Amino acid sequence: VSNGPASGQNDGARCANAPVVDEDSNIDFGDAPDSYLTLLASNGPRHELDGITWLGTTPPDADLDGYVTPQSDETVGVDDEWANGGIGFVTALEAGLDSKVVIEASTTGYLSAWIDWNQDGSFDGANEQVFTDYQLDAGENDLFLNVDINALTGTTWARFRFSQQTNLSYFGG
């Protein structure tokens, strides 16, 4: 017998472990395999959309959770993370050298970024945080990052977080 109150997201049944799903999410999540702590269940990176703060030319769309494959959240046809993501690697990433990155910011704010140099599926390795609370101006910003001397050759993942707050981690809200 169901005797709980019904709502727009609840049929009235009392389920102790029922997830709360906000179909009107105003939150943007990160995109990467979950070994990088991407999903909400893994305390994945997320921020509330403020209509002011983002990287690139297009404001991000809201997500219900993190996405673990490239472009997997683009079912609505808004390419906010990829083509207009605001991050351009101008020079090659070569171990032990500096690499130029152009970051386009919608407003002033703080950038923190990680690159999985050792390709172990996490961002917690030595020297994997490449920017920490780097203050960006609105528009294009030319930055240089040092590629770790022990960086492995091949495809890897990166996470860039831009916020009005400092001290952000590669995971968490």
Q: How would you describe each model-predicted region?
A:
Residues 2-22:
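Blade-level signature of beta-propeller repeat domains, shared across WD40, Kelch, NHL, RCC1
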Residues 22-173:
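A broad "non-catalytic interaction surface" signal
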